[in-house]
Amino acid sequence: MSEASQPAYEIALAHFIVSDDVERSRRFYTEVLGGTTVRSGEPTYITLANSAIIINVGGGPTDDKPAVTLETPRDPDLASSFLNIRVSDIHAVYAEWSARGAEFLTPPKQHATEIRCYLRDPDGYLIEVGQTTLPGGWRQFLNP
């Protein structure tokens, strides 16, 4: 993206997670994945690397989303979206997070342009952990 096309305001991307137990999810994202709690309660804010995760209970509709109700996944084996965490050493992350209690679906697997594996959070959300094997690694996608 060129300098000229940068917006005149800041943008940050955060992942919002609906949880049946906000405190349990907070512990998972901090104690297992290594995030930092910025704010506890409903909602809870966690920073993880250069990103943010917001955890709150479900509910709705509300005045700003009048036809939307937020809930945890009904079937964790059906996903239309998932958190994707890019790392520089997937084997180290896999070992560290496994030791902290993460339950991965499989060990890291080699694919065409990445090594990846998946785990679930306490509410059943799918999380991909991936290491790009292309020259330049994952940072190339941030500054093309």
Task: Indicate residue ranges for each PLM-predicted region.
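Short Gly/charged-rich anion-binding patches and loops
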Residues: 24-25, 92
